[in-house]
Amino acid sequence: MSEQHDDLVNISMPKSNYQKTPASLDVMDVEQAVRDRYGAAAQAAESALCCPVDYDARYLKIIPAEIIERDYGCGDPSKHIQAGETVLDLGSGGGKICYIGAQVVGSEGHVIGVDRNDDMLDLARKYQDQIADSLGYANVEFRKG
């Protein structure tokens, strides 16, 4: 297929920042590039990394600003989960969705965040105890995967 799809560029990235990937770039280079990009994003906020989402403000009150500023998620699943459920967040990043989910599922539920990036996992785990203290229960865990 030799069709060109320049109109299918990630909408979160200004077209001027878009670079075509060389055909010779192998899978391991791409995986390393993703790890590097999200590792850097765990250290300093990157506004063009993903799509902005409006979250329910009541769930954001206990989440530290550092996590909110470094959230690169593309959706808010809080309307689709219920008290007592177990939630799995793949690509959990800094943990924002996990900490929102922790509030929705309550003390009887459980949230598991999985990310492949050590820097993002470090950011998510950094505030685990503080958030558990705010909630009055600990129901979130983060795993590498």
Predicted feature locations:
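N-terminal auxiliary segments of SAM/dcSAM-dependent transferases
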Residues: 2-53
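Electropositive phosphate-/nucleotide-binding environments in soluble metabolic enzymes
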Residues: 28, 32, 71, 114
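Short Gly/charged-rich anion-binding patches and loops
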Residues: 33, 76, 96
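Conserved alpha-helix/loop element of class I SAM-dependent methyltransferases that forms part
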Residues: 50-86, 100-104
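Class I SAM-dependent methyltransferase SAM/SAH-binding core
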Residues: 86-90, 94-145
